[in-house]
């Protein structure tokens, strides 16, 4: 580890520095996807994020050069570590030091597993994880749509599409998301407080969260967001799910198409999403809708001995 470097707990005065590191490690630079300090503050202020206890920064000469944030998912006994190190400070052992902090935090939380997501092309990060006892367990595709023709949703009789309503639909969305993703790898059930905070983030709009209903009963949903600059806008399909009782009716395609229509109507230049590479039905649906695979990330895990009592 570099002489003079310290790894310490995050402080709220670190928001701008952490934002700069986040943008650097994700190659966001001056793109429309870059976080600003206000959005990072919103993100870190969400319920259960707790950055003062579960975020650590690496600092040298009063400069924050890296960070790690540990997300604690108590319902499924999991923690997720995310973060990284500024480009000029890599290959100096700082990333390994931050990873060790994440491992220690996960152990103190008594979780069963710690997960870390890295680029499939991040050979250095993969080597560090493997030497620290992590094993690759899952791949995710990042996909992009650049089409001009928007697919149109086709609904069975009696079904309709409506937008989310702030102050009314938080519990509905929470319940639908939890039941739709209950059996999916890595999904931790959400609380109403968590969903209420997320729908109010700057890059979300109520109109961009869509429900398909069956005579008023929520059957499927699509949750979109938009990152925009003065010159470019990218739309994201962040979550999409169908209630188990309504699967096999074509609602998955219909709700994704509805989300795509909404995003294109807002003037986005492209639409992006990610999907579990082993989720064949979802992956094939996106391919049929015109999405192309543009990147892949890998999930690594470190398991901990099961604790009794």
Task: Please place each PLM-identified region on the residue numbering.
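A short beta-loop-alpha structural element at the N-terminal edge
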Residues: 5-18, 160-175
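C-terminal "cap" of GNAT-fold acetyltransferases
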Residues: 142-164, 169, 269, 274-280, ...
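Acyl-donor-binding surface of acyltransferase catalytic domains
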Residues: 72-78, 86-158, 300-302
């Amino acid at each position: 580890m570099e002489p003079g470097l310290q790894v310490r707990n995050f402080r709220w005065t670190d928001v701008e520095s952490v934002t700069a590191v986040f943008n650097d490690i994700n190659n966001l630079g001056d793109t429309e996807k870059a976080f600003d300090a206000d959005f990072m503050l919103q993100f870190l202020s969400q319920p259960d994020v707790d950055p003062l206890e579960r975020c650590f920064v690496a600092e040298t000469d009063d400069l924050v050069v890296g960070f790690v944030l540990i997300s604690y998912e108590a319902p499924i006994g999991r923690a997720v570590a995310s973060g990284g190190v500024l480009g000029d400070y890599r290959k100096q052992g700082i990333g390994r030091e931050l990873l060790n902090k994440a491992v220690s935090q996960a152990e103190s939380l008594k979780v069963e597993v710690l997960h870390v997501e890295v680029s499939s092309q991040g050979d250095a990060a993969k080597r560090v994880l493997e030497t620290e006892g992590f094993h690759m367990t899952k791949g995710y595709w990042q996909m992009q749509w650049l089409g001009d023709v928007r697919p149109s949703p086709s609904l069975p009789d009696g079904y309709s599409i409506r937008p989310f309503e702030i102050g009314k639909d938080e519990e509905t969305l929470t319940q639908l998301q939890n039941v739709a993703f209950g059996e999916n790898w890595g999904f931790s059930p959400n609380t109403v407080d968590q969903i209420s905070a997320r729908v109010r983030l700057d890059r979300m709009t109520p109109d961009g969260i869509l429900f398909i209903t069956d005579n008023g009963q929520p059957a499927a949903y699509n949750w979109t967001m938009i990152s925009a600059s003065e010159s470019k806008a990218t739309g994201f399909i962040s979550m999409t799910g169908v209630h188990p009782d309504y699967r096999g009716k074509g609602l998955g395609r219909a709700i994704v198409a509805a989300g795509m229509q909404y995003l294109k109507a807002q003037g986005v230049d492209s639409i992006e999403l990610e999907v579990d590479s082993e989720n064949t039905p979802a992956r094939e649906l996106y391919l049929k809708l015109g999405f192309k695979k543009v990147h892949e990330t890998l999930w690594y895990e470190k398991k901990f001995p099961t604790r009794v009592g």
